[in-house]
Amino acid sequence: MKTPFRKMDGLGNQIIVADMRESTHALTPQAILALAADPQTHFDQIMTIHSSTQKEADFRIEIWNADGSMAKACGNGTRCVIAWLTDHNLGESFRLETPAGIIEGKRQTDNLISVDMGCPNFNAKEMPVSREIADTNYVKITAGPLKDACLVSIGNLHAIFFVEDNIQQIPLEKYGPKLEHDPLFPERCNISIASVTSHKSLNLRTWERGAGLTKACGSAACASAVAAYRRGLTQRHIDVNLPGGTLNIVYREDNHIVMTGPTKYEFGGFLNPLTGTYKKDHF
């Protein structure tokens, strides 16, 4: 019942990558909550690797938040999966089956991993939201100084609020939970505040659905880059500066979003998928 795992850092995003391909047991809610409660294994997302069910993909991944809920996308977690796969000599580029569809990733250098997150979705009915919205670029929703969100789905839904103030001075820990659970979002929402610093860069902070305030969120970085371009604030190729570091985002002419950034190995070992107990080992 030993499942190989790694604790990794995806630009401040705390990620566990677990290889479930040979496991006879699924990861239980008890195990997820136990790992989240342990200071050494506390995580934002768990990325579990499985054999693919589609011939177009090399592997299948599932994504778990720290509260035990499932996510459809996690850009930084996906970059950590790509790093794990390449470190184990399983290839240099991969097509991964995810809850949001098949996405592609590859190692650029020893430290930099790129992931093609696919195309953003601006269709309100597919996000989903609870009321009809004519223009997802400007949505009337307010919390304190935050208003007029831009809604973008990158497999999971993001609300981006652009502000002129220093984003560090806005108490996102206060407004994030309120907006995440707003009745507009029947499946909850990721909440970000962004400040454009030039036509080539912006600063970003994110309250992540199911995880809370986080140092980095890859899909939020992608969503903010797309939102800024839609509003005419930036060009297609920008740097997104997060508390954990910088991600390079390219919103290509073919509508695909490519995210590039570093990953870091913290420790590895084997875990029990039923209980969440683990033993450190070099893995």
UniProtKB/Swiss-Prot annotation:
InterPro entries: DAP_epimerase_AS, DAP_epimerase_DapF
EC number: 5.1.1.7
GO CC term (a single one): cytosol
Annotated active site: C74 (proton donor), C217 (proton acceptor)
Pfam families: DAP_epimerase
Binding site for substrate: N13, Q45, N65, G75, N76, N156, N190, E208, R209, G218, S219
Reaction equation(s) it catalyzes: (2S,6S)-2,6-diaminopimelate = meso-2,6-diaminopimelate
Predominant localisation class: cytoplasm
Superkingdom of origin: Bacteria
Pathway the protein takes part in: Amino-acid biosynthesis; L-lysine biosynthesis via DAP pathway; DL-2,6-diaminopimelate from LL-2,6-diaminopimelate: step 1/1
Described purpose of this protein according to its UniProt entry: Catalyzes the stereoinversion of LL-2,6-diaminopimelate (L,L-DAP) to meso-diaminopimelate (meso-DAP), a precursor of L-lysine and an essential component of the bacterial peptidoglycan.
Record note on quaternary structure: Homodimer.
Family: Belongs to the diaminopimelate epimerase family.
NCBIfam families for the chain: DapF
PANTHER family per record: DIAMINOPIMELATE EPIMERASE, DIAMINOPIMELATE EPIMERASE, CHLOROPLASTIC
Name assigned to this protein: Diaminopimelate epimerase
Provenance organism: Bartonella quintana (strain Toulouse)
